């Protein structure tokens, strides 16, 4: 799990909207691939998956105050699509953050 502080409180709906608008287009641009990810609000977290290629989720993001608790599926840590998604997510979290400030609280 990785915990990031974005120094700003956001709702799951705000996070979901940003990811739905920008994640797939950014992925297509970076990987030159037509893979489309499913981004869903699952009540207590936002989940990113791609059921045609991967069993289960790729990322789960839970919001706790100003922190984002990010769980990455242990089955796909070395997968190139998962690594690309992580890079894009980090950029989008900067966009979401207060003044672009993202602080790593925990990575493990």
Model regions: which residues?
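Generic N-terminal initiation segments characterized by hydrophobic and/or small/turn-forming residues
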Residues: 13-16, 56, 89, 93
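Polar/charged, Gly/Pro-rich intrinsically disordered segments
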Residues: 6, 44-63
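Negatively charged, low-complexity tracts enriched in Asp/Glu with abundant Ser/Thr
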Residues: 1-47
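Short, low-complexity, polar/charged sequence segments that are solvent-exposed and flexible
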Residues: 22-26, 65-68, 88-92
């Amino acid at each position: 799990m990785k915990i990031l502080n974005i120094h700003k409180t956001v709702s799951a709906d705000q996070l979901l909207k940003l990811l739905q608008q920008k994640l797939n287009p950014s992925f297509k641009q970076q990987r030159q691939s037509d893979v489309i990810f499913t981004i869903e609000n699952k009540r207590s977290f936002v989940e990113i998956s791609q059921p045609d290629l991967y069993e289960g989720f790729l990322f789960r993001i839970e919001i706790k105050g100003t922190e984002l608790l990010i769980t990455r599926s242990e089955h796909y840590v070395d997968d190139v699509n998962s690594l690309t998604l992580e890079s894009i997510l980090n950029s989008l979290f900067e966009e979401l953050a207060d003044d672009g400030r993202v602080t790593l609280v925990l990575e493990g």
